[in-house]
């Protein structure tokens, strides 16, 4: 077990605090919507985490990239797909710096607008079935999904 014993419980990472954190998030994006119904986008970003009391902003990504595409057709249908990468994350485990695996998330979805106020949707998540930690020691679900309705009031 990679945990840190604290009495009868085990934590998977150290809990630390930072009295002042400065966060600068620089992003650049390109969007394409020239074809009717088709929207494509790519966003890349860098996060600067200014910390003084810790070596790093633990478990926070320095780099992120996201690709998204949606297509609307027959007035009521929409399908889409996305890819998101979060990179350069570090965790503090038992006093040691541990480089965390990058997150690569692939999702697809579809929705149908049944009424002006009612939409039915389904979404498949983590289709690459990546076993990465959202937080150190907290593994994400494998392939999973969600289905539901959205109602506007």
Regions found by a protein language model. Give the residues of each.
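Face-selective signature of the C-terminal outer-membrane beta-barrel domain
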Residues: 1, 23-43
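Outer-membrane beta-barrel domain signature, especially the mid-to-C-terminal portions
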Residues: 1-23, 45-66, 84-113, 127-148
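Residue-level signature of outer-membrane beta-barrel architecture
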Residues: 30-34, 46, 71, 112, ...
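Repeated loop/turn-to-beta-strand initiation elements of outer-membrane beta-barrel proteins
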Residues: 36-42, 75-80, 116-122
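Gram-negative (and chloroplast) outer-membrane scaffold detector with strong preference
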Residues: 64-82
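Short C-terminal domain-edge/linker segments immediately following a structured domain
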Residues: 72-77, 111-112, 142, 150-153
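Non-catalytic surface loops within mature trypsin-like serine protease
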Residues: 75, 85-87, 116, 126, ...
